[in-house]
Amino acid sequence: MQEVLWREGSVKWIRLNLFREKALVSHICYLVTFYTYLKTESIISSRDHDKSHLTEPENDIKSIVKGKVGNKLMTLSEVKSLFLTLKNSSAPVYTEGGSDKEFCLLANGFWQAEGYIGGIFRSGLNFYPLCTATQLFSIESAKFFIRLNKALCNKGTFSITLNSFGKFVIAYRLSGWDTFFSVFVPYFKMLYGEKYRAILKLNKIYALKNHIKQTSDNMSKVHLVSLVYSLTGYSSNYKVSLEEKLLSLGLDPALLKELPKVSYKDNAIKPSFLFILGFFLGDGTLHLKLEWKEKNSTVVICPLFNIVQSNAESNKYIMERMTDTLNALNIKTSLEKSATTYTLTVKGINNVFNSLIPLLKNYSHFLYGKSHSFNLLVWVERLVNSGGHHTYFGLIALVNKIYASTNKRFTDKEVWMDRIEDWLKVASARRDTGEYSIYSIYTSDHKVRGWQVRFPSTFKLPKSNKAFICSTWDGQDKALAAAVQYRDKILSDWINKNF
């Protein structure tokens, strides 16, 4: 029997819905942001020191509509004010840790997971490149984008919108050919799959765009439009089909068959751990699963690190490369394909606590919105390494710690408390004394003369073993009661002090 304590619902249900929500967040934010810009021209550039890219005029009624930032309800005006405070802070967020080179690798991984590289036709064949990335708004996501904008020479713009889930979303955008070639391309050299090929295609689109200015070559025009429609790898999802677009431009769709077949190689550079960490920031989870083994009344602690992507062919290459990189770092990693997803997984105490967490600790300043889950697992790691999870008080502390967070659960806390009581009964029944960590002291003729509290050597306790002799305590029962009281005090004080 399994229970997931740090995630809502079943694992498969969560993964699918997280994937759907992320996709919808990106889609809605993209549409709302650029529709707002075109219709209201309400963008204020992030290059203005005092203001940021705001999606609605300040006097718009939407400014008072409330949405969620985490679990807190805020108005759009309040969210914008919070963002401006962070952006214009006297202690800039881009000085909070890690070198610029390290952050660049992190940002490449994040853009691989969450970024969009494409554009729009402004009119006719006048194609305009747009590179965007979105996240649910939080202080941490705002800090990330502010630092990214600084790294990109403050060339980007920001927007804050309310999505259909009632949550605020922050979007970051770079636009225009000059910015694309002078800022985006030099910085994002570590992309893969469709995003890597999109950069190559945009180079070709730009060349065709200039060529078409000099000639009325219909084949070049068809080539340009077909490249635009292939940028994301999801051309079938466009509302206006490729053929319809060509017809609207007075071009014959039959010319598509005459285009030369061109294949684009993928990025051959091996992704770094920081790239994977950035990808994890966009599409990963770090969480804790508790399993209850009914047969022997045992609580099993299972930490997990996951990155999930749709099972589109374009995602296969990078998921395989990231899996290879982690395995090369002696972090045992699996990659599974389902009907809808690829899932990269690092699982178990040894793989997560002993192999992955030490690397994450080196870059904890780059964890942004994942800091809460990381800190929880670091706490659990300390408990496990000390042996505290093999004690009644340690298990109680573990469940209390997990349920102290605001995440919803489908198993009541009381269920786990009852299971811990069952664990205590079984663990105690294994000793002839009927108490765990308490052992009988026998005379030479095998009569009980007392009890000894003796803790396993794996417990990181100060020297605490102690004997309780029956003659000193006026009988076996009183000596055993004193031993139990001593054991519980030592263990509870140890857990309370350290955890």
Predicted segment positions?
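Internal intein/HINT superfamily modules and their associated LAGLIDADG
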Residues: 1-450, 456-460, 465, 470-473, ...
